[in-house]
Amino acid sequence: GMSKEEARKKVVEMLADVKIPNPEVVAKQYPHQLSGGMRQRVMIAMALACKPKLLIADEPTTALDVTIQAQILKLMNDLKREHGTSILFITHDLGVIAQMADDVAVMYCGQVVEMAPAKTLFTDCEFSHPYTEGLMVSIPRLDTPAGVRLESIPGSVPHPLNLPKGCKFAPRCKYCQQRCLEEEPELVNVTEEQQVRCFYPRKEERRANLK
């Protein structure tokens, strides 16, 4: 254990580590007196206090404006390097994934449907899960002509108590075949570093099936 004075000094030190200005003052304040970005930094300091080998960050940038989000992501990257901490990001923000992740697991209906290095996921690679493909084409791009609508994935995620037979994504998949409705695919290796849960993981093959 430590004395109250030692604990106070440790708190101030941790707040300083996450780049909070005037940590001695902030340590005495209540949460409602801090901005959203400051509260997020305090949470990160609390999580790092015990020097974990793994930090789980569940939607760490939700409800933050883009400037504060960039600051928080830079902070987490810096802390990862300084402390040697691995970070497990849980997020729906593809921009955060592209900026922060080394490896990505894409989940749908509680299942991992694809695992790959981030650099593979964000390039026009040979293989992918149709859900991953749908996510990627929904990203706004600077070169998209004015007036062109973004693509979206039809339908909605099924209720956990009423999941479809076969592939869980089949009812929403434009590449769906009869086999997909009857059998559930396994997560299989399509390359040395990529796994996909789909009977038709090769993009060229499944697009040919549409013709």
Give the ranges of each region predicted by the language model.
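Charged, flexible cofactor/metal-binding loops and thiol motifs
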Residues: A118-K211
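Conserved ABC ATPase signature
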Residues: Q29-L34, M38
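A short, proline-enriched helix->beta-strand linker immediately N-terminal to the Walker B motif
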Residues: A49-K53
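P-loop NTP-binding/switch modules centered on Walker-like glycine-rich loops
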Residues: I56, P60, L64, I68-V148
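Conserved ABC ATPase "signature" region
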Residues: E5-V25, E133-V137
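Interfacial catalytic loop of ABC nucleotide-binding domains
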Residues: V25-Y30, V148
